[in-house]
Each structure stands twice: as C-alpha cells, then as structure tokens.
Amino acid sequence: MSDSDVHVAALCGSLRDDSHTRTALEVTLSAAQRAGATTELLDLREYELPIFDADRDREDAGDAEALAARVRDADTIILGSPMYHGSYASPLKTAIDYCGFDEFADATVGLLAVSGGAFPVTALEHMRSVCRALNAWVIPHEAAIPNASAAFEDGEFVDPKLEKRITTLGRRAVQYAAIEPDPDSFESDQNVGAQGK
C-alpha cells in the first residue's frame, strides 16, 4: 500500500462546539494529508448513537451501522478524547461499543487525549486497553495535550513542540497504516499450567 492509498479517519469523542480535541484532531489529519493520505473527521455530534444496548441490533441503533462502516473503511483510525474523571469520554466509548472486531481487529490505531489539567495518562491507558481487547495495533507514538485552555490561541498551537507531537501522530498514522500485526497469541497446550496440571 502506498501512502496515497491510505485513508485515515479520526473519531472525535468530544461533543463541545469549541472542542480542543476536535481542533487537535484536525491538525493531526492535516499532517496525515500532507503525508499523502486521504482523511476524514468522524464528528460524533453528527451521529445519532443511543447508549449501547447489547440486546439491540446495530441496524436498529440510529446511525451506529453508518459509523461502523466509516470506521471499517479506514486504514488507520485515530481516537481522540477529552479526559473526563480520569478516563476518556462516554460518546467515544459508545461509538467504540457499536463497533467491534470487524472494525478494529488488525487495524492501526492512533491515540490522542486532551485534558484541562494534568497530563491525560489514564485516558490514553484506557483507550489503549480497549484497543488491545479488540486486537487493534496501537501506534507507539501517542499524543496528549495537558492544560488545553492554555495550549491554543485562536485555534492554533501556542507551543511548537506540542504541535510537533500532534503532527507526528498524523504522519505515523500514514507510516504505520499497512503494518502487519503479529498473529494472535494463544496458549500452548504444552503449557502445563494452562491445563491445570
């Protein structure tokens, strides 16, 4: 796959109109475009997604099927979220819950978290854990924006080093789009501990 064949989609977990997460994702996607990819911002404000109910078919859950199809079409998915109470935002969790292995298994995923205060480590950790559970391959380079209200001025990054971290995520999203993850691991039947012996 050449860089010009790569499609990068970013899922924005913030519903705020003046979202720092959305601004950062737009910068990330611009960097991916400059690296040769086509890009798409999946703004969850534009999708009707009821709270996930496992008893409801995805086809009967508002725009869930349409969103899942857009995620499936991406070569790399970037998850972006503000940090709320030490984790990532519920709109993003709902969107991911309506997806699954068909959308995320063996997919390349980039992570971006934004916080109004301290470094959003736990939000990144929680997103990474969910991606692992879905057998996705997470780009080693993660992007985080602490103290978000001071990070931007008129929609632009104040700190060039922080902006570089965000644009690097966009470039890596293109660079790693065609990575072949290791085969799923399995417990060997030679492992006596696994057999209860």
Language model: regions and residue ranges:
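Glycine-rich phosphate/pyrophosphate-binding loop and the adjoining helix
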Residues: 3, 138-197
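N-terminal beta-loop-helix "entrance" segment that forms/cooperates
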Residues: 44-61, 153-155
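A general structural signal for well-ordered alpha-helical segments in protein cores
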Residues: 21, 25, 64, 89-92, ...
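Helix-loop-strand module that forms the ligand-binding subsite of alpha/beta enzymes
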Residues: 62-134
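Residue-level recognition of beta-strand->loop/alpha-helix junctions
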Residues: 12, 43, 142-144
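Conserved beta-strand segments of alpha/beta enzyme cores
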Residues: 38-40, 137
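N-terminal beta1-alpha1 ligand-phosphate binding loop
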Residues: 2-37
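Cofactor-binding loop segments of dinucleotide-utilizing enzymes, especially the Rossmann-like FAD-
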Residues: 13-15, 44, 113-116
